[in-house]
Amino acid sequence: MKLSRKILKFTEPLTYRRGWRRAQRSIFPVPLKPMLAQIDGDRAREIQQEYANSTAGYAKYADIEPWLRLNRERVQDLNLHRSAPKRVLDLGCGGGFFLFILKNLGHSVMGLDIDRVPLFGELLELFGVRRVVYKIDAFEPLPDLGQQFDWITAFSTNFYLYHPAKKRWGTAEWDFFLRDLQHHLAPGGKIFFGLNPSYNGGYYTPEIRDLFLSRGADVERERIFFGDGLRF
């Protein structure tokens, strides 16, 4: 790529934001070695060996370190490594990598997910991360979680799909969901969604994007960030 094109590309808002986040990760690093030292190494190796020959798609998560590195970036991009202790709820928490890092940084954490993948339960136990077992469905409120949260997050989840048709939620479903999250969000709390792309490559319809914006979100492709709570 010619230098002029590289410079032009970097001046684009999306490219600039992503470049700035990468720079910030280098300026304010989060060492993983002390966190890995907190893990029972023998048990971690047992889990890895248990799934080493598995053809299941989720078996890749048994190799812990790459997923900790990915989730370290998520923590850094939300500035939670430079934050006072917060109460964090992660929807679709999977194996708990994101929450494990936050716990080691002094935050109070809770995951919410279905109990369909045994590996995730093993990882959560290894990490000492609490999970509430619950399936998120359209037009159904979340359970009473006993507290409100300063942050509610969700990364690469599929709760906003109807199964088995894999049809995505519309504006009515999302609006109900956001209104319900409001009850679980502490005053001044924040919400972040990292959405999966649909089969056509998009992340949401124009109508859903408009809904996110009307509720106070900053929308950057797959990144939906309500930095000052929800607006109704």
Regions found by a protein language model. Name each.
Residues 188-195:
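Conserved beta-strand signature within the Rossmann-like core of class I S-adenosyl-L-methionine
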Residues 64-85:
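Conserved alpha-helix/loop element of class I SAM-dependent methyltransferases that forms part
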Residues 85-94:
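Conserved class I S-adenosyl-L-methionine
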Residues 95-105:
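Conserved SAM-binding loop of SAM-dependent methyltransferases across substrates and taxa
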Residues 128-139:
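Conserved SAM-binding strand-loop segment of SAM-dependent methyltransferases
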Residues 151-171:
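A short SAM/SAH-binding and catalytic strip from SAM-dependent methyltransferases
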Residues 142-152:
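A short acidic, Gly/Pro-enriched loop at the edge of an enzyme's catalytic core
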Residues 168-187:
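A short glycine-rich, Lys/Arg-flanked "PGG" loop and its adjoining helix->strand segment in the class I
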